[in-house]
Amino acid sequence: METVESSSSAELLRAQTHFSRQVFSFQNFAALKCALQLGIPDAIKQHGKPMNLSELTSALPINPSKAPCIHRLMRLLVNAGYFAQENECFALTSLGRLLLKDDPLHIRALVLSEFHTALVMPWFALSEWFKNDDVAPFATAHGKSFWDYTSCDPELRNVFDGAMACDSHLIAKALVTEFKYLFEGLKSLVDVGGGNGTLARSIAKAFTNLKCTVCDLPEAVANEQGDGNLDFVAGDMFDRVPSADAILLKSILHDWSDENCVKILKNCKRAISGKDKGGKVIVIDGVVELQKKAGNDDPGLDNMDMQMLVLFNSKERNEKEWAKLFSDAGFSDYGIVRTFGWWCIMELSP
């Protein structure tokens, strides 16, 4: 067996470089969060053209004594691809434009949520959790479950809902164009756990004859207003799901254990069981290994799987695991419509 001592200097340097990139990768994300909080992307856009360092620092709400440090922050973010630098001026890249407040597909909330203190702390409790009896590392770090914590912390709840909305904007664009046939012939649809209704609003706007309902916990829908063919109802998917031609579950089941998933799915099946033919449940979630078979080598779903472990002690599932859940919940058949990005669309028949 080869030892470290027997490795060549070049091999050791490559290993050190690899570890350095991994260890320091968090700095790129922390710097990006800082840039958002300081308003750097929007400052550059509002300027209307690339900004030099003096113009940029003058536009930011910072202590003047810290202005000389901005160029070091920008250097890191340029290397990470969020900004471009030419002739001592900074401009937005296509990636950086996704950080603008007014971009309809912006991912600002996703960035801010992933580096929220309350969501980072459980990662540092991971090794302790492996040794104790807590349900999830989040509980080890905070003394309560994620859902109990967010119910008492409106700020974190808003950040979390905003992150889910970012994801929903991207998915909605695909659903109402490439996958619009999923909604053809339907008269009613319930988006279970749909939060502020980002996804349901897009569907309702695209299909004006489809009655769309968002069903979520009271605190999630308390301040939401329905409009036209969209409304909001307070409810608990573990107790009952409102009746409809179709039930939509987007990024819901990966938050829960197999046992809880079966409970949710059974309630969804009851909600469509009284309908004429065409009743179905639409699940949008990850399917481990399927993306790789489709040529997507992005390790993002592996990262998401660990995120589910840390927050909820839940997981991303492979097709065999999904099939068992659907069968245990009483569904007669399912089909995977298509994969896109990390996500798969699955149609369940009662």
From Swiss-Prot:
Reaction catalysed by this enzyme: cephaeline + S-adenosyl-L-methionine = emetine + S-adenosyl-L-homocysteine + H(+); deacetylisoipecoside + S-adenosyl-L-methionine = 6-O-methyldeacetylisoipecoside + S-adenosyl-L-homocysteine + H(+); 7-O-methyldeacetylisoipecoside + S-adenosyl-L-methionine = 6,7-O,O-dimethyldeacetylisoipecoside + S-adenosyl-L-homocysteine + H(+); norcoclaurine + S-adenosyl-L-methionine = coclaurine + S-adenosyl-L-homocysteine + H(+)
Expression across tissues: Expressed in roots.
Functional note: O-methyltransferase involved in the biosynthesis of ipecac and benzylisoquinoline monoterpenoid-isoquinoline alkaloids natural products, starting by the condensation of dopamine and secologanin, and including emetine and cephaeline, drugs used both as anti-protozoal (e.g. treatment of ameobiasis) and as emetic agents. Mediates cephaeline 6'-O-methylation to produce emetine.
Binding site for S-adenosyl-L-methionine: G193, D216, D236, M237, K250
GO BP, sorted A to Z: isoquinoline alkaloid biosynthetic process; methylation
Keywords, comma-separated and alphabetical: Alkaloid metabolism, Cytoplasm, Methyltransferase, S-adenosyl-L-methionine, Transferase
pH dependence: Optimum pH is 8 with N-deacetylisoipecoside as substrate.
Temperature dependence: Optimum temperature is 40 degrees Celsius with N-deacetylisoipecoside as substrate.
Record organism: Carapichea ipecacuanha
Protein name (database record): Cephaeline 6'-O-methyltransferase IpeOMT1
Pfam families: Dimerisation, Methyltransf_2
Annotated EC: 2.1.1.396, 2.1.1.128, 2.1.1.-
Subcellular location: Cytoplasm, Cytosol
Annotated catalytic residues: H254
